[in-house]
């Protein structure tokens, strides 16, 4: 279990804290979505969890031990831009480089590489120059490197935001399903409202504070929260929410398809 307790952080020469006494727990096998606007503290939280920054106040524990003593190699990070994380010429070289850095014996590497390439379906691309891979293939390549070293926590920082919706949705399902089978922790930093429905738990950050923690089933009860914090709700959902308030009905748990919302409105306005 990951335990974050009273975590605060202020950058040098900044007057105010970027994070203010953030506390939350994440159980093994749980997928936590962290959502908020730019400036909400999401990026700073990523840097603290990933070991790029040191907390000035508060603690981060994993399985009842401080994360610094456990080692940040327990965390696998998937960033927005895979080119930042891929340093070798080919995926095969990248995997060898990754495994060497984690002290894996050379005699064990071929088996691990074969296993992870099978999972991410890139066996036929392992010797292709990385620069010739598509953006989605590069993200899968980074994910292969993470799978190879078996992290306990997967930290995704806007990892799918540069992909088009079709590829993004397919890659999300693949990544989240794969991690779920391992019973590992996923922390998905996002500004995409649709990601919330893929999570087990959600925390909403605003101006460095944790405003609320809730389950995906409660999203429709939190629409005022999102609306009051000027969050861009999907238009069909926003329309349903506003109409529901006007006619004193509960916002329906609908898809984001406009036709579904229009049908619901017509039914209740008859």
Swiss-Prot record:
SUPFAM superfamilies: P-loop containing nucleoside triphosphate hydrolases. GO terms for molecular function: ATP binding; ATP hydrolysis activity; ATPase-coupled transmembrane transporter activity. Keywords: ATP-binding, Nucleotide-binding, Transport. Disruption phenotype: Probably essential, it was not disrupted in a global transposon mutagenesis study. InterPro entries: AAA+_ATPase (IPR003593), ABC_transporter-like_ATP-bd (IPR003439), ABC_transporter-like_CS (IPR017871), ABC_transpr_CbiO/EcfA_su (IPR015856), ECF_ABC_transporter_ATP-bd (IPR050095), P-loop_NTPase (IPR027417). PROSITE patterns: ABC_TRANSPORTER_1, ABC_TRANSPORTER_2. The keyword Transport applies. It comes from the Bacteria. ATP binds at residues 36-43. One of its GO terms (cellular component) is ATP-binding cassette (ABC) transporter complex. The keyword Endoplasmic reticulum does not apply. CDD domains: ABC_cobalt_CbiO_domain1. Residues 1-232 form the ABC transporter domain. Belongs to the ABC transporter superfamily. PANTHER family: ENERGY-COUPLING FACTOR TRANSPORTER ATP-BINDING PROTEIN ECFA1, HEAVY METAL TRANSPORTER. This is Putative ABC transporter ATP-binding protein MG304. It comes from Mycoplasma genitalium (strain ATCC 33530 / DSM 19775 / NCTC 10195 / G37).
């Amino acid at each position: 279990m990951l335990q974050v307790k009273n975590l605060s952080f202020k950058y040098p020469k900044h007057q105010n804290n970027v994070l203010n006494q953030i506390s939350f727990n994440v159980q093994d096998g749980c997928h936590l979505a962290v959502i908020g606007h730019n400036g909400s503290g999401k990026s700073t939280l990523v840097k603290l969890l990933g070991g790029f920054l040191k907390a000035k106040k508060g603690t981060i524990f994993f399985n009842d031990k401080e994360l610094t003593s456990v080692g940040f190699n327990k965390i696998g990070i998937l960033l927005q831009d895979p080119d930042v994380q891929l340093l070798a010429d080919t995926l095969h070289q990248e995997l060898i480089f990754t495994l060497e850095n984690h002290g894996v014996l050379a005699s064990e590497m071929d088996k691990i590489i074969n296993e992870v390439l099978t999972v991410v379906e890139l066996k036929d691309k392992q010797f292709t120059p990385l620069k010739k891979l598509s953006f989605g293939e590069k993200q899968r390549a980074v994910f292969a490197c993470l799978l190879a070293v078996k992290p306990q926590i997967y930290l995704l920082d806007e990892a799918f935001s540069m992909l088009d919706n079709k590829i993004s949705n397919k890659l999300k399902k693949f990544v989240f399903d794969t991690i779920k089978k391992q019973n590992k922790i996923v922390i998905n930093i996002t500004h995409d409202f649709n990601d919330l429905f893929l999570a087990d738990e959600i925390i909403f950050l605003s101006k460095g504070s944790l405003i609320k923690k809730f389950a995906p089933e409660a999203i429709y009860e939190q629409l005022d929260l999102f609306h009051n914090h000027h969050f861009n709700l999907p238009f069909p959902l926003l329309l349903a929410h506003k109409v529901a308030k006007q006619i004193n009905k509960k916002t329906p748990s609908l898809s984001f398809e406009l036709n579904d919302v229009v049908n619901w409105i017509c039914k209740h306005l008859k």
